[in-house]
């Protein structure tokens, strides 16, 4: 396929800027709204479960979609689907504004339409998850169509950088600011930003229809099997996926209870909580800017090891303290390590996997890397609820951070052997079994 100029990448980067800003606003607004509806950690964690569940049950089909159909159109239609779902949620919130509490209540809120709103939120969360897994898989497969392999690490670094700036630096505090006006304001902005993103995606020029040698009439299960077999025979990518999956499991275990941790143990309001995320934003932004330079100076195995160490330290720190500045700093370490890992791992697999299989193999990889997220989320909420009955509320909310830190230490100690530079070099030279 003919490579387009930097113009196409800049259009993709701009589209990602607006869609990630929308995601950042929504990423703050939805959990905060839900914390006004209930104080039950299990009920809150179910939202995260449903958003992530499609990564477990639908991701392999998303890979087939990305290989069968025009990836640019997939990015367009999934964003429009998000606009439609968000619009439904706006109407639902508007009709119930008089009943939803305006401030956090540490006792369980009670109002007539509570069950309806929570049930609708669960359904919409699952639908959002379906669109997101389809969009994200297509996006990672689309990038090599407009960027040369040599420029993939730099391009991925810029995309991760934009994601962090808009998602955390801008999206989270803007979400906190907007929700101060009205509960529906952040969601209205979300839909507008997604529409702007669609405008830039459709401006990308090129021939992005799938090649004729892809048999679109081939049985879906056979296409999925091809992707599974390819990854099964690549030891490096298989291990990278498993490592990512374990780390994401414990990250997703912590995420749904973080809002309760911040409100109850640190005592933050909406604006203060949004600024807590600046720690993650700063760490991730620095990581996105230096990842390419670090990758150029260090062997891949060393970069991956540093990533695991930083992510683990950041994951464990909130167990030790509720100081908001230290917690924000721990978020920064985790984010830096996560970006460093992702730039390296994503670039490796984009360079190694053939375009004709990229969507499917990428989906199998993401199944291993992200498929445990819904289980981690429900486990996190359940374990807090169980421990809350036998121990202090503080210990219950801190325990997921202790557990995550322990398992990240295990990953760190095993990485030098399982993700060795020798294995990486063999894989790049196509000599791996």
State the predicted function of each range.
Residues 96-97, 141, 145, 187-217, ...:
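Helix-loop junctions on the cytosolic side of multi-pass membrane transporters
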Residues 124-167:
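Cytoplasmic helix-loop-helix junction between adjacent transmembrane helices
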Residues 1-9, 206-242, 433:
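Juxtamembrane intracellular "pre-TM" segments in multi-pass secondary transporters
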Residues 41-42, 149-159, 270, 355-365:
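Loop-to-transmembrane helix entry/capping segments in MFS-fold secondary transporters
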Residues 31-37, 91-104, 169-189, 264-265, ...:
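Transmembrane alpha-helix termini and helix-breaking/packing motifs in multi-pass membrane transporters
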Residues 1-56, 233-280:
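Helix-loop boundary and gating motifs at the non-cytosolic
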Residues 56-61, 68, 72-74, 78, ...:
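C-terminal transmembrane bundle of multi-pass solute transporters/carriers
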Residues 80-113, 309-322:
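C-terminal ends and interior cores of transmembrane alpha-helices
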């Amino acid at each position: 396929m003919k490579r387009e100029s930097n113009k196409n990448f800049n259009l993709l980067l701009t589209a990602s800027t607006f869609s990630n800003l929308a995601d950042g606003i929504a990423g703050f607004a939805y959990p905060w709204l839900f914390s006004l509806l209930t104080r039950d950690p299990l009920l809150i964690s179910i939202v995260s479960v449903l958003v992530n569940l499609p990564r477990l049950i639908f991701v392999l089909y998303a890979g087939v979609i990305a290989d069968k159909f025009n990836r640019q159109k997939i990015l367009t239609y999934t964003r429009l689907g998000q606009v439609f779902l968000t619009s439904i949620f706006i109407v639902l919130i508007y009709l119930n504004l008089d009943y939803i509490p305006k401030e956090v209540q540490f006792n369980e809120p009670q109002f007539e339409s509570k069950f309806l709103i929570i049930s609708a939120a669960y359904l919409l969360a699952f639908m959002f998850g379906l669109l997101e897994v389809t969009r994200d898989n297509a996006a990672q497969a689309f990038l090599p169509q407009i960027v040369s392999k040599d420029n993939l690490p730099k391009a991925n670094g810029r995309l991760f950088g934009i994601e962090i700036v808009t998602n955390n630096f801008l999206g989270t505090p803007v979400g906190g600011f907007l929700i101060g006006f009205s509960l529906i304001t952040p969601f209205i902005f979300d839909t507008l930003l997604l529409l702007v993103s669609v405008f830039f995606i459709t401006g990308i020029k090129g021939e992005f229809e799938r090649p004729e040698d892809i048999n679109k009439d081939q049985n879906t299960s056979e296409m999925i099997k091809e992707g599974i077999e390819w990854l099964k025979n690549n030891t490096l990518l298989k291990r990278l996926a498993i490592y990512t999956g374990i780390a994401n499991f414990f990250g997703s275990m912590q995420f749904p209870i973080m809002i309760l941790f911040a409100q109850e143990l640190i005592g933050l309001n909406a604006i203060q909580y949004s600024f807590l995320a600046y720690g993650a934003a700063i760490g991730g932004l620095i990581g996105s800017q230096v990842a390419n330079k670090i990758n150029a100076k260090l062997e891949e195995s060393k970069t991956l090891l540093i990533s695991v160490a930083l992510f683990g330290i950041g994951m464990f720190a909130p167990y030790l303290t509720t100081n908001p500045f230290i917690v924000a700093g721990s978020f920064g370490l985790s984010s830096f390590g996560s970006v460093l890992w992702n730039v390296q791992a994503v670039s490796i697999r984009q360079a190694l996997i053939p375009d004709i299989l990229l969507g499917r193999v990428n989906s199998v990889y993401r199944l291993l890397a992200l498929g445990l997220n819904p289980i981690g989320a429900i486990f996190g909420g359940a374990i807090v609820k169980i421990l809350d009955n036998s121990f202090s509320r503080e210990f219950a909310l801190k325990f997921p951070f202790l557990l995550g830190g322990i398992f990240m230490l295990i990953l760190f100690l095993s990485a030098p052997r399982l993700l060795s530079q020798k294995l990486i070099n063999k894989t790049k030279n196509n000599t791996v079994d």
